[in-house]
């Protein structure tokens, strides 16, 4: 199985151009002296976060990126042109790691954010630099320096306002397809969702981004099943929608399994605000519905919302509950930004 949220890429900056060995040749000047120009610098390697990309799939097909070398120096003290840069365009939320996949190089969280990964090699000196009192006509010049090279890992963590979590087949993809324009792959077997799907939810003239995170199983934080890679996707969401399927025999145990995985993974996931819903509720009769909602309320220590993506029951209530948390987080963020700007103005004055 291949995933689109991680890719290993080779990058190389351009070599510097060589300096020129050249002598001034003009009429009536017999010994013109050296006039070899310097070589141009090699191209750099940049990475930039751009709009319109949601996955790293492009880096499955092209994994080697090399900037152009600098142009060699020329006579008449002309410096060679700098080599063309290479810019890796990635989705917002991409993190760049060194080859060990642990050392973070940069984290791109905004559209237009750029980071210089590798600098091109310096150009070599032309022979004009080697003229001295004892050597008026030097026939040597420096070669350009080689460009840097590196293997890097690109890792994408989705930046979504809310994340859908739950065991496989809890009805997450069906819910996402119901409330957004996203078209996730849906089938009745575990791990249908092999990479996260994003959708935009509109409710009461407001909107937020919802991510369908692939199904967790017991031991996911240690890489079991699809692995802990996907727990990383929910790190940046402001609120979690925890779906428990009404088809589960023991809904309380199912709820606790996912909570254990969130706690074991760490990174504050278990402290995030959570909305709990019993999905696929249309499969239950009235008595089963009451029993399972009560058991879930006891396990979660909060009321669980009934939900059916098939009939539409409870969908609006769940979305409004999520929107309230998302809106509160946005207002808190805006207030913090305003306070920061005010403090900055006072510091500058």
Swiss-Prot record:
It is an enzyme of class 3 (hydrolase). GTP binds at residues 166-173, 191-195, 212-215, 279-282, 308-310. CDD domains: Obg. Mg(2+) binds at residues 173, 193. GO terms for biological process: ribosome biogenesis. SUPFAM superfamilies: Obg GTP-binding protein N-terminal domain, P-loop containing nucleoside triphosphate hydrolases. InterPro entries: G_OBG, GTP-bd, GTP-bd_Obg/CgtA, GTP1-OBG_CS, GTP1_OBG_dom, GTP1_OBG_dom_sf, OBG_GTPase, P-loop_NTPase. Residues 160-327 form the OBG-type G domain. Its cofactor is Mg(2+). GO terms for cellular component: cytoplasm. Its EC number is 3.6.5.-. Its main location: cytoplasm. Belongs to the TRAFAC class OBG-HflX-like GTPase superfamily. OBG GTPase family. PANTHER family: DEVELOPMENTALLY REGULATED GTP-BINDING PROTEIN-RELATED (PTHR11702), MITOCHONDRIAL RIBOSOME-ASSOCIATED GTPASE 2 (PTHR11702:SF31). This is GTPase Obg. It comes from Chelativorans sp. (strain BNC1).
């Amino acid at each position: 199985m291949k995933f689109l949220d991680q890719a290993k890429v080779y990058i190389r900056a351009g070599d510097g151009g060589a300096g020129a060995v050249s002598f001034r040749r003009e009429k009536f000047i017999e010994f013109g002296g050296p006039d070899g120009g310097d070589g141009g610098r090699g191209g750099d390697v940049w990475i930039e976060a751009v709009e319109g990309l949601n996955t790293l799939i492009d880096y499955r097909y092209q994994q080697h990126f090399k900037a152009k070398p600098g142009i060699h120096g020329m006579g008449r003290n002309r410096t060679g042109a700098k080599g063309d840069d290479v810019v890796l365009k990635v989705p917002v939320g991409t993190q760049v790691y060194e080859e060990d996949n642990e050392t973070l190089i940069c984290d791109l969280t905004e559209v237009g954010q750029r980071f210089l990964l590798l600098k091109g090699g310096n150009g070599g000196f032309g022979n004009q630099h080697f003229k001295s009192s004892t050597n008026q006509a030097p026939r040597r010049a420096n070669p350009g320096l080689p460009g840097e090279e590196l293997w890097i890992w690109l890792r994408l963590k989705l930046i979504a306002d809310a994340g859908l979590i739950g065991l496989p087949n809890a009805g997450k993809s069906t819910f996402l397809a119901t409330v957004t324009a996203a078209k996730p792959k849906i089938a009745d077997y575990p791990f249908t969702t092999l990479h996260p799907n994003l959708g935009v939810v509109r409710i009461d003239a407001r909107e937020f981004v919802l991510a369908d995170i692939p199904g967790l199983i017991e031991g996911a934080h240690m890489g079991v099943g699809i692995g802990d890679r996907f727990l990383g996707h929910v790190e940046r969401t402001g609120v979690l929608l925890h779906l428990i399927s009404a088809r589960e025999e023991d809904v309380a145990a199912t709820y606790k399994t996912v909570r254990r995985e969130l706690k074991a993974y760490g990174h504050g996931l278990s402290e995030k605000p959570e909305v709990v819903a019993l999905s696929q509720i249309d499969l239950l009769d009235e008595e089963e519905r009451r029993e399972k909602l009560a058991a879930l309320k006891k396990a979660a220590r909060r009321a669980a919302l009934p939900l059916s993506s098939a009939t539409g029951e409870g969908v609006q209530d769940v979305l409004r509950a999520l929107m309230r948390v998302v809106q509160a987080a946005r207002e808190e963020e805006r207030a913090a930004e305003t306070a920061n700007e005010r403090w900055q103005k006072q510091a500058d004055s």
